[in-house]
Amino acid sequence: MSKDLKILCKDPALELSCYRDHQFSGRKFQQEKLLKESSTLNMGNLSFYTTEEKIHELFSRSDIRNIFMGLDKIKKTACGFCFVECHNRADAENAMRFLTGTCLDEWIICTDWDVGFREGQQYGRGKSGGQVRDEFREDFHSGRGGFGRQTQI
């Protein structure tokens, strides 16, 4: 396939985002290589009320291996993200292609590649136990726990 044709056939939904996990212990090029081969998705912008069952329902046309719901590290309640392990890269690519921008529980979800789930990764990294981005939110969102934690202090 020519270089020009490859550019035309590129699917922007499958490209790597600029986000990199800062807790990854290897080098940047190693992380990018793993991301390009990964069959694990990180789903974000989920409602705090989204359940594992709803994620299974969303992936009903795919055969998935595991779902790891993101948890507030203090309260052990959902905090708006999850990891979905697919059996192969093709299933993960289809999910990425068709689920990015889908509305679930009145929230538009976003998907990104992840190098693979590691124990402890399911916990939010914010000071209050949830996601960092929710701590600085200044507006009220009932689906994401109300006001941001830092704005309440």
UniProtKB/Swiss-Prot annotation:
SMART domains in the record: RRM
Gene3D superfamilies: 3.30.70.330
GO CC annotation terms, alphabetical: nuclear cap binding complex
Start and end residues of each RRM domain: 39-116
Name the record gives this protein: Nuclear cap-binding protein subunit 2-like
GO molecular function, one term: RNA cap binding
Pfam name, any one: RRM_1
